[in-house]
């Protein structure tokens, strides 16, 4: 006899993924055994069954490629067959009429619950007399028909998936209802178990393949097969499909119906392929991509798993991508056209066919689901695109604007564009504008796609050029006006959800011209500081010669700005000095000005300090004081604050001498750092000294400028400048004072330094010598390591003494948990373990408990163990130094 399997869904909802997986296994088994696959619609529940659900089930099975050989059969058309079978059971005395009301049954269940018994029917109406039946009918009660199930019955079958399965009659809940209530001698509507058995017998079903949640029904149905005299089929109960928490997948988990997966963009081939793997392992476990026909050739229930199968969305997406990447372009285009149309994209399936296939070729390698094409191809269906922030930043570059302008001059909107033309155009632009190829490519991507990432750039340009969209986007990206033009090829539907991407029928017209592009130098150095940043100007002092120095001060801030102008004073000559310093920062910068004082000769000292910071900025200007000659001093201080304030520095007073001394102090801190550049003092010779100090800080740094002082004698006076900080930073200046001679001993320099430090009320710091002190670092590390190793047992002992109670409690809890866990495993495996093996396991547990108590829990033994460790250490390492 040939194999006959069936799928029997109930039309109370759309085709569920679990029902579809059951259909796949039935179909595969039938094809493997050269049998028949029969479809039966179990619609006996007329209150919940709907025709639209029936249609959804049939359409879903056809969409998956699960064509049935016979059917569909409808149970609602087979009532007469069920009534005859039920009446035969009544005639044989295997079934009876039960007149219990719903209230009586509920009262019975509550009583059983109070006695902590499993709810079941107590068979109270199994042996009613005719007189009792007439009395119930006289009360107007209608009787259901129940099938007798004796408690002492044993039901056993060999399951194709689970092996031998045994049920007791006492576990089936008492006599089961097989027909709904009806008056008199009528037989009511059949219930599930009765209708299923009658249909399977009538259709000669040989194998019943369904989910494991039907195992209890199988025991009841086997009793009905025997009572009706039918041949019992073989049963196979497949594992359930679980959600990520390990529970049965249900409607509460969201996407569960086949129509939902279809809406999400999965192809039927990919979904059917994945459902094969939900509980079944192919002979070659590494071969995960196959058709239903290929799976049917290898299918067997020996490779169906017993454990539930978790639904893995990542695995499904991967399988879907494999199918889409290998699908021919024409077939994939046919599948994507309705998806584009549903998204509101205007296209001509016939006239645009060639262009659409080029688009499919471009996006196919990136597709995971069919619906991904909506977002991926959006930029190709509209004349213009909006630039994101990265693209806008790219197009603010002067080289980008020049590149796009050059492309507009070269490209011909009416001529076809080929790959060779694109490459030649890019080469010409790089030579003409003198920019790197990367700049041109980034500019093209930003203007054409509105983003800095996307599909292949050249292929995208070719597609956009065919629609005439490339010229429009080039012009818009650099701020040129776009004339109102009717778009013939593509227009935006009024109902499209993508209105923000641009109009469909009329090109956007930009009336606001784009800001002129900054020069390359400006784009590299002029960046506004962020919140809480202040730029610090640098003041310079001219020499006593006819020199004109122009400096500009520019401070740009985002939120908090502090601008302090610098007062400059010319020397005794006709000198004009304009001071302005530009400080430009990216995130947070602090520029520390250094004031320089010229000597009485042709000496020029230039000191520049560049400081880059990450977060905060403080600007501290420095004022300089000229010598005792014709001096004009103009000082103006303007302070603009938004959030924070900065204290103005202190200027020092020079005397009229030919010697200049510059004092600067550098203090470095771990978190809050204050960096002060160090100024050197030139002698009265023709010397030019250039000093630059660069300080990089991590969180918040403040650079404190130091004013220089000229003396009238060979004595130099050092003055420290104190700057108030924004957060918590202090600058401690330390000056070094050289004498007017060329030779000076180290002791004299140190003495001078100490004296200067005392005058400044600061700690002396030796900034003169660069001597290196050699330290035997390896020996120190070795000694430190040995000390740590020798003290480790003491540390452990102290830790144990401190937390002795907690550690003991934790140890006992862990021991109890491990013991009970182990004992549970042993008890569970008692059937398969010989008694001798159990004894050895118990001995092992007892020894483990004794060992822990003997060596780890008792204080005396623990101290003994520590003493032994100490002795071993002394023998190996000797006494610690």
Swiss-Prot record:
Motif 'HIGH' region per record, residues: 9-19
EC number: 6.1.1.17
Catalyses which reaction(s): tRNA(Glu) + L-glutamate + ATP = L-glutamyl-tRNA(Glu) + AMP + diphosphate
Membrane topology: Multi-pass membrane protein
Ranges annotated as biased composition (Polar residues): 549-562, 577-590, 605-618, 633-646, 661-674, 689-702, 721-730
Region of interest called Glutamyl-tRNA synthetase, as start-end residue ranges on this chain: 1-480
Ranges in coiled-coil conformation: none
Major subcellular site: cytoplasm
Gene: gltX
Name of the molecule in the record: Glutamate--tRNA ligase
Function according to Swiss-Prot or TrEMBL: Catalyzes the attachment of glutamate to tRNA(Glu) in a two-step reaction: glutamate is first activated by ATP to form Glu-AMP and then transferred to the acceptor end of tRNA(Glu).
Disulfide pairings: none
GO cellular component entries: cytosol; plasma membrane
Family (UniProt): Belongs to the class-I aminoacyl-tRNA synthetase family. Glutamate--tRNA ligase type 1 subfamily.
Keywords assigned: Aminoacyl-tRNA synthetase, ATP-binding, Cell membrane, Cytoplasm, Ligase, Membrane, Nucleotide-binding, Protein biosynthesis, Transmembrane, Transmembrane helix
Membrane-spanning ranges: 809-829, 832-852
Location of this chain's protein in the cell: Cytoplasm; Cell membrane
InterPro entries named in the record: aa-tRNA-synth_I_cd-bd, aa-tRNA-synth_I_codon-bd_sub2, aa-tRNA-synth_I_CS, aa_tRNA-synth_I_cd-bd_sf, CAAD_dom, Glu-tRNA-ligase_bac/mito, Glu-tRNA-synth_I_codon-bd_sub1, Glu/Gln-tRNA-synth
Positions occupied by motif 'KMSKS' region: 248-252
Biological process, per Gene Ontology: glutamyl-tRNA aminoacylation
Signal peptide range in chain numbering: none
Region of interest (Disordered), residue spans: 488-747
Assembly information from the UniProt record: Monomer.
Entry keyword annotation includes Metal-binding: no
Biased composition (Basic and acidic residues): 488-502
Keyword Aminoacyl-tRNA synthetase in record: yes
């Amino acid at each position: 006899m040939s194999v006959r399997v069936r799928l029997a869904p109930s039309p109370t909802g759309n085709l569920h993924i679990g029902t579809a997986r059951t259909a796949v296994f039935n179909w595969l088994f039938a094809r493997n055994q050269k049998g028949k696959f029969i479809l039966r619609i179990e619609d006996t529940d007329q209150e919940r069954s709907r025709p639209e659900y029936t249609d959804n089930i049939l359409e879903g099975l056809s969409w998956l490629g699960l064509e049935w050989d016979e059917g569909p059969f409808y149970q609602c058309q087979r009532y007469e067959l069920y009534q005859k079978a039920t009446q035969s059971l009544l005639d044989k005395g295997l079934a009876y009429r039960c007149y219990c009301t719903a209230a009586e049954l509920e009262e019975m269940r509550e009583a059983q619950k109070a006695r902590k018994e499993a709810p079941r029917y107590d068979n109270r109406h199994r042996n009613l007399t005719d007189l009792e039946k007439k009395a119930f009918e006289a009360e107007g009660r209608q009787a259901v028909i129940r099938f007798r199930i004796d408690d002492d019955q044993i039901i056993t079958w060999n399951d194709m998936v689970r092996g031998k399965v045994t049920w007791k009659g006492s576990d089936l809940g008492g006599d089961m209802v097989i027909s709904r209530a009806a008056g008199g001698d009528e037989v009511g509507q059949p219930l599930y178990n009765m209708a299923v058995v009658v249909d399977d017998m009538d259709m000669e079903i040989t194998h019943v393949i369904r989910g494991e949640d039907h195992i209890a029904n199988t025991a009841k149905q086997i009793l009905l097969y025997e009572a009706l005299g039918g041949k019992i089929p073989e049963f196979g109960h497949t594992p359930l499909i679980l959600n990520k928490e390990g529970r049965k997948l249900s409607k509460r988990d969201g996407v569960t119906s086949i129509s939902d997966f279809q809406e999400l963009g999965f192809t039927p081939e990919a979904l059917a392929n994945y459902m094969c793997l939900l509980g079944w392992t192919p002979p070659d476990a590494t071969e995960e991509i196959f058709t239903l026909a290929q799976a049917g050739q290898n299918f067997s229930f020996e490779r169906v798993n017993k454990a539930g199968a978790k639904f893995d969305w990542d695995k499904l997406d991967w399988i879907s991508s494999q199918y889409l990447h290998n699908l021919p372009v024409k077939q994939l285009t046919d599948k994507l056209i309705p998806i584009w149309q549903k998204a509101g994209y205007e296209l001509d399936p016939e006239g645009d066919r060639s262009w659409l296939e080029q688009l499919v070729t471009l996006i196919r390698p990136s597709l995971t689901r069919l619906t991904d094409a909506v977002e991926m191809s959006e930029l190709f269906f509209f004349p213009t695109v909006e630039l994101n922030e990265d693209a806008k930043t790219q197009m603010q570059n002067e080289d980008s604007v020049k590149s796009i302008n050059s492309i507009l001059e070269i490209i011909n909107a009416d001529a076809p564009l080929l790959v060779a033309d694109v490459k030649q155009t890019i080469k010409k632009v790089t030579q003409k504008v003198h920019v790197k190829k990367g700049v041109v490519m980034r500019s093209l991507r930003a203007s054409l796609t509105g983003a800095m990432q996307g599909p292949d750039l050249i292929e995208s340009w070719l597609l956009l050029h065919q629609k005439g969209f490339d010229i429009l986007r080039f012009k818009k990206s650099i701020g040129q006006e776009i004339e109102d033009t009717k778009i013939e090829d593509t227009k935006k539907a009024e109902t499209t959800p993508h209105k923000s991407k641009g109009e469909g029928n009329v090109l956007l017209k930009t009336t606001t011209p784009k800001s002129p592009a900054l020069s390359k130098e400006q784009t590299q150095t002029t960046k506004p500081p962020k919140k809480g940043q202040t730029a610090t100007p640098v003041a310079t002092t001219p020499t006593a010669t006819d020199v004109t120095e122009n400096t500009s001060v520019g401070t740009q801030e985002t939120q908090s700005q502090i601008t302090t102008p610098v007062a400059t004073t010319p020397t005794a000559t006709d000198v004009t000095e304009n001071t302005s310093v530009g400080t430009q920062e990216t995130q947070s910068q602090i520029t520390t000005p250094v004031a320089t004082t010229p000597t009485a000769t042709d000496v020029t000292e230039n000191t520049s300090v560049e400081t880059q910071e990450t977060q905060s900025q403080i600007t501290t200007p420095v004022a300089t004081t000229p010598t005792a000659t014709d001096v004009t001093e103009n000082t103006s201080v303007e302070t603009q604050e938004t959030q924070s304030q900065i204290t103005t520095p202190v200027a020092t007073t020079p005397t009229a001498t030919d010697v200049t001394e510059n004092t600067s102090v550098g203090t470095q801190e771990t978190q809050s750092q204050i960096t002060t550049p160090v100024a050197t003092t030139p002698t009265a010779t023709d010397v030019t000294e250039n000093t630059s100090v660069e300080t990089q800080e991590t969180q918040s740094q403040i650079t404190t400028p130091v004013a220089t002082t000229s003396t009238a004698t060979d004595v130099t006076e050092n003055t420290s400048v104190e700057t108030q900080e924004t957060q918590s930073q202090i600058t401690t200046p330390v000056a070094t004072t050289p004498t007017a001679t060329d030779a000076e001993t180290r002791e004299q320099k140190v003495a001078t330094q100490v004296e200067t430090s005392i005058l400044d009320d600061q700690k002396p710091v030796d900034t003169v010598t660069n001597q290196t002190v050699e330290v035997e670092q390896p020996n120190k590390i070795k000694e430190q390591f040995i000390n740590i190793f020798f003290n480790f047992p003491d540390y452990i002992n102290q830790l144990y003494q401190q937390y002795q109670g907690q550690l003991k409690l934790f140890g006992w809890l862990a021991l109890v948990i491990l013991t009970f866990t182990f004992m549970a495993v042993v008890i569970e495996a008692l059937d398969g373990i010989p008694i001798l093996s159990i004894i050895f396991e118990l001995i092992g547990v007892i020894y483990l408990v004794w060992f822990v108590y003997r060596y780890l829990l008792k204080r005396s033994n623990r101290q003994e163990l520590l003493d032994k460790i100490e002795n071993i250490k002394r023998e190996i390492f000797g006494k610690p130094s």
